From Swiss-Prot:
Segments of this protein annotated with the region Disordered: 181-205
Pfam hit, one: bZIP_1
Note: One of 8 closely related fungi-specific YAP proteins (YAP1 to YAP8), which all seem to be transcription activators of the environmental stress response and metabolism control pathways and to have similar but not identical DNA binding specificities.
Span of domain bZIP: 237-295
Organism: Saccharomyces cerevisiae (strain ATCC 204508 / S288c) (Baker's yeast)
Protein name: AP-1-like transcription factor YAP4
Keyword terms of this UniProt record: Activator, Cytoplasm, DNA-binding, Nucleus, Phosphoprotein, Transcription, Transcription regulation
Gene, per the UniProt record: CIN5
Molecular function in Gene Ontology: DNA-binding transcription factor activity; DNA-binding transcription factor binding; sequence-specific DNA binding; transcription cis-regulatory region binding
Length: 295
């Protein structure tokens, strides 16, 4: 059967209209298949121009079935609070935290324009009152002020300990906007940072660290400049690498072996000189004795 369904923008106005068309035939009589069997019968003809359905008319071929009634929930728009676009930007964070629009939580609110339409339920006071209601633009001045106060204070931990607790939200944009150098004072160096770190230690630990920093091991045969850097024969600072340290230790061992060998040679030379002197004296004595025997 041909059924036309007309809707007036609401699912309650389903008005099925039945078109008479015989769907039965006598099964006892055989039906011959001819060329005209494939031609549609006149009752199923096309809709005339004056009877053509408008945009809200749907033509379907189905049995006499009543379509179910569907209630569509209201969809959140840009004007409603708590709307989040695809890019992730929030139009109103305070409305988003204080209200929840869920399609499953709906209540039937009467509408003057038509029957009941399911609308989303607004649930308030879901966030504890202790949390501040700040948006992204109100957070940036607070972060910038805290970073500026860090420059005027040598010990940044004192201001943080005495400052009142204010919870805030940090986004990726505000976190990356502050450079890493802004967390340290402008006049800070690695040496000053190390000294400031030692001031927070106990007295015993501070004394041990100061002794370990002040003590410098000077090996024999090594020279250091005013900055405490190891220098070579030319006065240039030596490279502080593992390979260079191995080379310096090998050269030092070679110098020690050479000095020891030289000392041994000097002792042997002195002994040889004494023996030569004694030998010459003995020769003189032998010659004198020979001369006496001849006389």
């Amino acid at each position: 059967m041909l059924m036309q369904i007309k809707m007036d923008n609401h699912p309650f106005n389903f008005q099925p209209i039945l078109a008479s068309h015989s769907m039965t035939r006598d099964s006892t009589k055989p039906k011959k298949m001819t060329d005209t069997a494939f031609v549609p019968s006149p009752p199923v003809g096309f809709i005339k121009e004056e009877n053509k359905a408008d945009l809200h008319t749907i033509s379907v071929v189905a049995s006499n079935v009543t379509l179910p009634q569907i209630q569509l929930p209201k969809i959140a728009t840009l004007e409603e609070p708590g709307y989040e676009s695809r890019t992730g930007s929030l139009t109103d964070l305070s409305g988003r935290r204080n209200s929840v629009n869920i399609g499953a939580l709906c209540e039937d609110v009467p509408n003057t324009a038509g029957p009941h339409i399911a609308r989303p339920v607004t649930i308030n006071n879901l966030i504890p009152p202790s949390l501040p209601r700040l948006n992204t633009y109100q957070l940036r001045p607070q972060l910038s002020d805290t970073h500026l106060n860090c420059h005027f204070n040598s010990n940044p931990y004192t201001t943080a300990s005495h400052a009142p607790f204010e919870s805030s939200y940090t986004t990726a944009s505000t976190f990356t906007s502050q450079p890493a150098a802004s967390y340290f004072p402008s006049n800070s160096t690695p040496a000053t940072r190390k000294n400031s770190a030692t001031t927070n230690l106990p007295s015993e630990e501070r004394r041990r660290v100061s002794v370990s920093l002040s003590e410098q091991v000077f090996n024999e045969g090594e020279r250091y400049n005013n900055d405490g850097q190891l220098i070579g024969k030319t006065g240039k600072p030596l490279r502080n690498t593992k390979r260079a340290a191995q080379n310096r230790s090998a050269q030092k061992a070679f110098r020690q072996r050479r000095e020891k060998y030289i000392k041994n040679l000097e002792e042997k030379s002195k002994l040889f000189d004494g023996l030569m002197k004694e030998n010459s004296e003995l020769k003189k004595m032998i010659e004198s004795l020979k001369s006496k025997l001849k006389e």
